[in-house]
């Protein structure tokens, strides 16, 4: 099944990051990025957006995770300048027919994102 799936887990508390805002962008030929879609992480920890269930052309993409606002809304991060605020993760698609799964694991102080196997 082609497409992109994004799964977000707040590993500092061992729960999915329900309510975190996430976006997907694509790179244009001039190197600038254009937003394709955005939404919030659901109760399963997934960015459920119909735009993710398509074949994405080969190229450069950017997943954007609003970590700081999420932790502020949860009462965990405070202050005007959290350590992590908005995280950009750039990745490429070489084979459009393959599914790309992006597991994003975060705390208020760090994150991990990689190509998963789901």
Model-predicted segments: where are they?
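Compositionally biased low-complexity segments at domain edges in trafficked proteins
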Residues: 94-118
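Beta-strand-dominated extracellular/periplasmic modules and repeats
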Residues: 2-90, 94, 101-103
């Amino acid at each position: 099944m082609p497409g992109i799936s994004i799964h977000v887990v707040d590993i500092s508390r061992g729960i999915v990051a329900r309510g975190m805002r996430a976006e997907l962008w694509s790179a244009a030929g001039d190197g600038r990025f254009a937003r394709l879609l955005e939404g919030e992480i659901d109760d399963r920890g997934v960015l459920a957006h119909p735009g993710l269930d398509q074949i994405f052309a080969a190229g450069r993409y950017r997943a954007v995770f609003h970590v700081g606002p999420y932790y502020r809304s949860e009462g965990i991060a405070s202050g005007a300048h959290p350590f992590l605020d908005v995280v950009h993760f750039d990745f490429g698609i070489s084979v459009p027919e393959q599914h790309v799964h992006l597991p994003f694991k975060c705390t208020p102080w760090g994150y991990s994102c990689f190509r998963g196997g789901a």
